[in-house]
Curated annotation (Swiss-Prot):
Function according to Swiss-Prot or TrEMBL: Catalyzes the dephosphorylation of intracellular maltose 6'-P formed during PTS-catalyzed maltose transport, leading to the formation of maltose. MapP connects PTS-mediated maltose uptake to maltose phosphorylase-catalyzed metabolism. Is also able to efficiently dephosphorylate turanose 6'-P, and to a much lesser extent, leucrose 6'-P and maltulose 6'-P. Cannot use glucose 6-P, fructose 6-P and sucrose 6-P as substrates.
Catalytic activity: alpha-maltose 6'-phosphate + H2O = D-maltose + phosphate
UniProt-listed InterPro entries: Endo/exonu/phosph_ase_sf, Endo/exonuclease/phosphatase, TDP2-like
Protein name, per record: Maltose 6'-phosphate phosphatase
Pfam families: Exo_endo_phos (PF03372)
Signal peptide: none
Keyword Cell cycle assigned: no
Keyword Hydrolase belongs to the record: yes
Phenotype of null mutants: Cells lacking this gene grow significantly and reproducibly faster than the wild-type strain on glucose as carbon source. They are able to transport maltose and grow in maltose-containing medium, although at significantly slower rate than the wild-type strain. They seem to accumulate primarily maltose 6'-P when exposed to a maltose-containing growth medium.
Amino acid sequence: MNLLTINTHSWLEEEPLKKLEEIAKVILSSESEIIALQEVNQKVASKKVPLEQLTTFCPIATQTPIHEDNFAYLIVQYLAEKGQHYYWSWEMSHIGYAIYEEGNALLSKCPLTSEALLISESQEPTNYRTRKILVAETESSKGTLTVVSGHFSWWETPCTGFAYEWLQLEKYLAMGQQPLVILGDLNNPAGTTGYQLVENSYLPIQDAFVVAEETSGEATVEKKIDGWEENEAALRIDYAFVPKQWHVRKYEVIFDGRKTPIVSDHFGLLIQLK
């Protein structure tokens, strides 16, 4: 079973449709079963897609309408044209750059029962610090799972920012019974206080990079990007946390310009499980 995650920075890159296609090609070639996407954008002013046309879409109870330029919607359409059908969910987190409805997406080979969990102190959709995390239950080759696609805030204090958001998510996930897969952009580099909150969580999860039998690459950001304007280091801020009982065969950084082209200001991860 393979997992894939990437912060897509969608519609903000040069040649965005080419980059969308590159993401879809790797999903196909890797035969990934579950995919988590962050910074999945659609324009506020673009045309809505009628719900009846979204045949494999799994909405949340308070679903934001899907628009025809929704980046995840277009990826799913591309995959379907190639004969691979994915169920998917998406929900807006906040308005980005004044023109986009920005959110998180999940794709699965099986139907998703999804919800968006507000984890930030801010609740205003126009505030880029408002964070909603997409949480879903789905079947997989490893049984029923709870999967998360998340894009979190930066570290501020032990009571605000990332720390506050992680506490909200942690409390919510602790009520569940299924094995947990948490994928996404934590905005907290490995080894820092924010990362240690997750590493030391009472949730039964482990960092795929740490436990993998084989690793190819490590960092997922290697330059100055939005939110890391002063960065000059290679950072590991995108993660895959998997159930403690799972065996990780390989952790691979993708979309980094080596075997696969750069498609975003973040690199992606491909996790191969035994």
